[in-house]
Amino acid sequence: MFIAAVTHNWMERLAALSLLHYVLGAIFLLLLFHMLSNFFHPGLVDVPGPFAAKFTDLWRLFKVWQRRFKEDLPGLHASHRSTLIRIGPRMVSCSDPRAVELIYGFHTEFSKSDMVKAMAPIYKGKKQPTMFAAADNKTHARIRKPVAGAYAMTSIMQRMDELFIRPKRACDIHNWVQYFAFDMVLEMTMSRNLGFMKAGGDVDGVLKQLQKDLDYRGIALAMPIIDRIWRLNPVSKFFKPKQSGHFAMRCKRILEDRMAYEKSLDSRTQQQQDQKPHDFAHRFLEAQRKDPSISDGQLIGYMQANLIAGSDTTAVVMRTAIYYTLKQPWILQRLVTELDQYHGPLPVPFRIARFEMPFCGAIVREALRRHFAFIGMMERQTPPCGVVMPDGRRLPGGVVIGMHGDLIGRDRAIFGEDADEFNPLRWLARPGEPEAKYQERLRAMNAHDLAFGHGPRGCIGKHVAEMEIYKFIPTFFALIQPRFMRPEQSWTVRQLFVFKQSGMDMMLDWRQGKGLQSMA
């Protein structure tokens, strides 16, 4: 009896163990089949690239986590001697400048990849779109850009005088350009700001939360399935059916305040109604009134995209312009000489800085080219019928292909043999260069400048970013004489989704004859 019981017990254990083996074996076979189908994906077998990347997106995730993706990408193209590199089971990096128009042009049939899903904000448990039809030039002209720009420049100069110039203290300019950018874009978006410059730091943890959000997006961008598992899985939706991101809730409160304000004006006279601020929040609400299908969640998505494009990414460009201008004294001297020939009001008006100060404009263009703000590529998905690339190779439909702005921006055939260097002169006519040849060279550089994207899906925040950059750079150098605390040291560049530079501490002084009284 005892022996029979023991035998039965062991048989049950063996049966359970065998079942576990079968389950594990089935899972292993499924994974093996999945990875082999990835490796032998039709049309991509012959595209060179890292061996591991042909099986799984984990290779790209690891490179992003290492903060090496941008640095390693050019080396991959060089070592394989190929303009097409397979960096994922169904993902290809392209370094051929001839493909810019094919992939991103106005007549392209390429669609956006799953990248946009990982970038979308969460509101009430649902992802919200962030793309908004760009307003025409008349609409942009109605937005209170000049007022916002003047306010922000005056504020930052006052704070620099109070905190750094008079006390002779070092200024962490890498942080202050972000405070400036955030306050300015908030002024343009909702005609008020959160007071980053006044506080001299973060307010209510907004910048800290934004950084965490952008870091997460960098990881989710490398492997989109992480986002589906982490944020949008059924368990998370069940326990948090109306979850919203911290930043999304901040945008929600901004919109609610504006809606209450505009509703209070609806019953007033026409003259009083005309006093409504023509900022981005007003334009978003106007769009919703004309098209009721636009939800509050979509409005929050629009606003969030506006704030991110106009703050974090803009700060990257301004830091780059300041850093390289101070690192190369000849650039600083030539810029100051150009600024000294200007006798108009300060802050320098946008149109003058953009179109009448060629060397200042060249510095900004070079900063945009030299330091592409994002770690990732601008991804697109090939049309169902597939596509023939400029080198004659054919890619099947449904493949994600992209170009990295840094990779194209450093193409020597387009930007010159010194494409790895910071040289604003490349954007200007060379001594003795015929005008026709200069214009041809400039057109080629413009056509391959991906700083704000390219084609119909280019960055809708371009106008906002340019407004901030062209307002800050000339006014800062016209009034301030900066010098690095440790000029022999290089800055520190941190990367995940958006690059963040630091290590730019400097001493500030007013230039001779300049001061707060110089501001209009």
UniProtKB/Swiss-Prot annotation:
Glycans are attached at N137. Keywords: Glycoprotein, Heme, Iron, Membrane, Metal-binding, Monooxygenase, Oxidoreductase, Transmembrane, Transmembrane helix. It comes from the Eukaryota. Disulfide bonds: none annotated. One of its GO terms (molecular function) is oxidoreductase activity, acting on paired donors, with incorporation or reduction of molecular oxygen. InterPro entries: Cyt_P450 (IPR001128), Cyt_P450_CS (IPR017972), Cyt_P450_E_grp-I (IPR002401), Cyt_P450_sf (IPR036396), Cytochrome_P450_monoxygenase (IPR050121). The chain crosses the membrane at residues 16-36. This is Cytochrome P450 monooxygenase vrtE. It is found in: Membrane. Disruption phenotype: Impairs the production of viridicatumtoxin, but accumulates a new naphthacenedione intermediate, the 8-O-desmethyl derivative of anthrotainin. Its cofactor is heme. The keyword Amino-acid biosynthesis does not apply. Cytochrome P450 monooxygenase; part of the gene cluster that mediates the biosynthesis of viridicatumtoxin, a tetracycline-like fungal meroterpenoid with a unique, fused spirobicyclic ring system. The first step of the pathway is the production of the malonamoyl-CoA starter unit for the polyketide synthase vrtA. The aldolase vrtJ may be involved in the synthesis of the malonamate substrate for malonamoyl-CoA synthetase vrtB. GO terms for cellular component: membrane. It holds the Pfam family p450. The keyword Oxidoreductase applies. Its EC number is 1.-.-.-. Viridicatumtoxin and its derivative, viridicatumtoxin B, exhibit anti-methicillin-resistant Staphylococcus aureus (anti-MRSA) activity. Moreover, viridicatumtoxin and a C2 acetyl analog, spirohexaline, have been demonstrated to inhibit bacterial undecaprenyl diphosphate synthase, a potential new target for antibiotic development. GO terms for biological process: terpenoid biosynthetic process; viridicatumtoxin biosynthetic process. Pathway: Secondary metabolite biosynthesis; terpenoid biosynthesis. The gene is vrtE. Heme binds at C459. It comes from Penicillium aethiopicum. It is an enzyme of class 1 (oxidoreductase). Belongs to the cytochrome P450 family. It is a single-pass membrane protein.
